[in-house]
Amino acid sequence: MTDKSHQCVIIGIAGASASGKSLIASTLYRELRDQVGDEHIGVIPEDSYYKDQSHLSMEERVKTNYDHPNAMDHSLLFQHLQMIKNGTPIDLPVYSYVDHTRTQDTIHIEPKKVIILEGILLLTDARLREAMNFSIFVDTPLDICLMRRIKRDVNERGRSMDSVMAQYQKTVRPMFLQFIEPSKQYADIIVPRGGKNRIAIDILKAKISQFFE
């Protein structure tokens, strides 16, 4: 964990898939943006850095273990974080959950005072941990995560319930136990109940607001 307040502040939010990370990140972003303006705060999802699989067939893509650190291009993410800290804009990759690969599009992101970084595997990478000013782990029971994941993936990502359940049993739960849950030890703050924990969100808002003073 670094403390370089004169640079861009990187705040990491990790936890299981469908634990409420994105809800916390979006709530913090929306409420702080209303206070300081969107030119001062932004969000980067780790999912944008899934490796490009355009060279693989769709059959091969669906076999990828997306819950293993090797599925992520953390080197590119780390490079982009360093660029932002040095005042250089980045072009954020855009990942398609339907096609299981990156699209040709990118999103231009200018350096901000605060960047909220959210994703399941952020705390498994020592380089990313070092780049963060502080980190949060969203600690939500796996059965709740599973129910949320089924609803999300079926309604928003074009998945069938059978495929979601098969992936959960084959990779999501085992990888959580092997990689994600152990990475909780590196978090500075542990938040139970995800985005429903209003007290935790208010405490985090107060902490982040200090960086704008």
UniProtKB/Swiss-Prot annotation:
Cited InterPro entries: P-loop_NTPase (IPR027417), PRK/URK (IPR006083), Uridine_kinase (IPR026008), Uridine_kinase-like (IPR000764)
Signal peptide (from-to): none
Keywords: ATP-binding, Cytoplasm, Kinase, Nucleotide-binding, Transferase
Protein's pathway: Pyrimidine metabolism; CTP biosynthesis via salvage pathway; CTP from cytidine: step 1/3; Pyrimidine metabolism; UMP biosynthesis via salvage pathway; UMP from uridine: step 1/1
Compartments, record wording: Cytoplasm
BP GO terms, sorted: CTP salvage; UMP salvage
EC numbers, comma separated: 2.7.1.48
GO cellular component, one term: cytoplasm
Tree of life domain: Bacteria
UniProt-listed Gene3D superfamilies: P-loop containing nucleotide triphosphate hydrolases (3.40.50.300)
Binding locations of ATP: 15-22
Catalytic activity, reaction form: uridine + ATP = UMP + ADP + H(+); cytidine + ATP = CMP + ADP + H(+)
Gene Ontology MF term list: ATP binding; cytidine kinase activity; uridine kinase activity
Family: Belongs to the uridine kinase family.
NCBIfam families with a match to the protein in the record: PRK05480.1, udk
Descriptive protein name: Uridine kinase
